[in-house]
């Protein structure tokens, strides 16, 4: 799991090219921390936090994580991604556990052209036709 999350971080950083002008790289993380999928979301959060502890900087820039609970709900997942993009101004997003939640949040990220990497999505529709 640690290697997977580290790989995800590297992929996100590669996709965010111009985002390295600031001293801090803001990465959003949206996971089901409550609700029926909370167990999987908690495990993924532990993996993301472990990878962040191992790699708190990239190319000399501090990595700051913004974690949001999508409450195991598709509407909340879309709202969480919107909040990460509009309020927190993240340059990339990691998440989420649950393909249906990833598809809901993915639509928002795609429209905003913010790269998003799913850590455990299994449905091919999550990435089908997506550039970000």
Go through each PLM region and give its residues.
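Sec-dependent signal peptide recognition
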Residues: 2-10, 14
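Sec/Tat signal peptide C-region and signal peptidase I cleavage site
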Residues: 16-21
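Extracytoplasmic "Venus flytrap"
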Residues: 28-47, 55, 68-75, 97-100
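Extracytoplasmic/secreted envelope proteins and their assembly/folding machinery
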Residues: 45, 49-52, 78-82, 102-110
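Short helix-capping segments at alpha-helix termini
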Residues: 55-61, 112-114
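Short beta-strand elements in bilobed, periplasmic/extracellular small-molecule ligand-binding domains
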Residues: 58-71, 130-132
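Short, well-structured alpha-helical segments in soluble
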Residues: 67, 74-91
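Extracytoplasmic ligand/sensor domains, especially the bilobed periplasmic-binding protein
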Residues: 89-132
